[in-house]
Amino acid sequence: MVDFQLNNFSFDPVVSLGLAAFLFLLIALPISFWSVAGGSDSSKARFLVATSNLFLTSQLILRWWQSGHFPISNLYESLCFLTWGCTLAQLFVERAWRSPIVSAVATPVSLLSIGFASFVLPENLQSSAPLVPALRSSWLVMHVSVIMCSYAALLIGSILSFGVFLVDGKKQFNIRNSSFGSGSFRQSSELYLDERNENLNSIQPIEFTNAEQLDSLSYRSITAGFLLLTVGLISGAVWANEAWGSWWSWDPKETWALICWLVYAAYLHTRLTRGWQGKKPAILAIAGFFVIIVCYIGVNLLGVGLHSYGWFFDT
């Protein structure tokens, strides 16, 4: 590990880059709230989040160079990777809808993640260590990175669903906000087609409410996360069969990952087959948010099972 010392002061560039990312997210959060309150754009907050993502990218590359393996082998590295994924997912969502509401709702997730990694984890879990033999496999990058990216997309999608409750109160959703996205078009009732030239200007975009936009973007993010989670679970099963001769061992992490998959499968099922929109599917998405927290943080802190990084109760 690269570690500079000056007058008994230790400077770890990897940890410092994580702190820089935390600082930029910390500044971005109140700016997002002020933008929502003032009705201004979120370009400043978006710039800070993008800069934070660049810090995290540099941090992960540096840790990869230091350790010689993909930087996701302990809880600190995985939290930094999760924060990287969350900020990237947030930037993609804001590209689709440039509203300060997205930044105000999504930034706290990334801030808490990198804050937990930087200030709560003990120093021994922040340091890189050689991989155990079972993890020295090409499946490490495939399985773990895909799972972490799925968590990032699902967390951002779920927190956007929570935003549905915050921005529109008891307003009922119109069926026009299709689960397939917010790019629908309708024909204006105030204009008519000229029979001779069939003027296409009569086709005008629907104007969606903030809650409808959040609902649609949440659906898209969760769909992407669910697909990634499915790929991650399948790749994990293949890796487990190669390493231990068993596709599924009902390890605590595996069990909670399956519960997570089922919750989000129910979310997508209700939207696609029952036409649920707004608050009803949002409740399932929020439930999935807490299931991910238990699956990712809760099981790890107990220090049990093959997937745990360990901490409090790990002997």
From Swiss-Prot:
How it assembles, according to the record, is:
May interact with ccs1.
List the Pfam families hit by this protein, alphabetically: Cytochrom_C_asm (PF01578)
A single Gene Ontology CC annotation of this entry is: plasma membrane-derived thylakoid membrane
User: Where does this one sit in the cell?
Assistant: Cellular thylakoid membrane
Instruction: State the similarity comment.
Output: Belongs to the CcmF/CycK/Ccl1/NrfE/CcsA family.
Record-given protein name: Cytochrome c biogenesis protein CcsA
Q: Which NCBIfam families match?
A: cytochr_II_ccsB
- InterPro entries documented for this protein: Cyt_c_assembly, Cyt_c_biogenesis_CcsA, Cyt_c_biogenesis_CcsA/CcmC
- What biological process terms from GO does the record include? cytochrome complex assembly
Gene name per UniProt: ccsA
Q: One GO MF term, please?
A: heme binding
**Mode of membrane association:** Multi-pass membrane protein
Which key words are in the record?
A: Cytochrome c-type biogenesis, Membrane, Thylakoid, Transmembrane, Transmembrane helix
Q: What does this protein do?
A: Required during biogenesis of c-type cytochromes (cytochrome c6 and cytochrome f) at the step of heme attachment.
Organism per entry: Prochlorococcus marinus (strain NATL1A)
Membrane-crossing ranges are 14-34, 72-92, 101-121, 146-166, 221-241, 255-272, 282-302
Family matches, as PANTHER family: CYTOCHROME B_B6 PROTEIN-RELATED, HEME EXPORTER PROTEIN C
